[in-house]
Amino acid sequence: KDGYAELLADPEIEAVIIAVPLHLHAQVAIDAMLAGKHVLTEKLMAKTVAECKLMGRIAKEKNLYLATGHQRHYSVLYDNAVNLIKWGALGELHHIRAQWHRGNLPGRDSWQMPLPGGEIPIGGEEKDRFDKIANGIKSLERQVKAEKDPVAKQMLEGKLAQYIAWDSDKNGGQERALQHGFQDFELPAGHSRSALEELCRWRLWERTGGGLMAELGSHQMDAAGIFCSAL
């Protein structure tokens, strides 16, 4: 209930990982560094360039590590490509083409997460409510019951526990989202978006996310930067 203040006050903790919605990265990272903690943020580093610069200045002033978890920096494939460039094996670098084929289908990625308690389609009625989380719990319960392998069963039980905890946010989740600064909003088409939906689907909203270029395009820009820095 006290947020992360107690965590940052713990002298036994040396570093933190920032895994909150993008618009909160800067504030949490700055608070952590002011408390003397090293920081690893998920990408992007922050929502605005100004926030990134401020984070960098504080890290330098406090002599702390501040890193961003762009996955390409931890890939042996990209590390090998960097070495090939440094060795001159690829010749002179004139052009970089970066692409990543995810094959995402609408509604089947991590951007439009299911809402605790389910949701009614736009234009639908209560009888049309679809609860993907509750359905997932039922499916996992069946899988746990049928699984014979102890290791596989334990993994399924862990996933089931996550779904049950996720589902519990249907009770009080909206109020807690409002308390943490997320907002209700009326969309132009007449659809009412709750604070809980803004929290669960923060990548979809301009106030909380950075859009396609931030979430996906940044990987390709980062790849180009990695290779250019090898020159």
Give the residues covered by each predicted segment.
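N-terminal glycine-/serine-/threonine-rich beta1-alpha1-beta2 phosphate-ribose binding loop
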Residues: 1-35, 50-65, 115-174
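ADP-ribose/adenylate-binding Rossmann-like module
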Residues: 35-48
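Short strand-turn motif at the edge of the Rossmann-like AdoMet-binding core
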Residues: 43-45, 69-72, 100
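Rossmann-fold dehydrogenase core element
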Residues: 54-72, 81, 90-96
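Active-site rim elements
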Residues: 68-70, 203-214
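Oxidoreductase and adenylate-handling cofactor-binding alpha/beta cores
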Residues: 75-97, 110-114, 159, 166, ...
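Rossmann-like NAD(P)H-binding beta-loop-alpha module
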Residues: 77-142
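Active-site-adjacent bridging/hinge elements
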Residues: 189-203
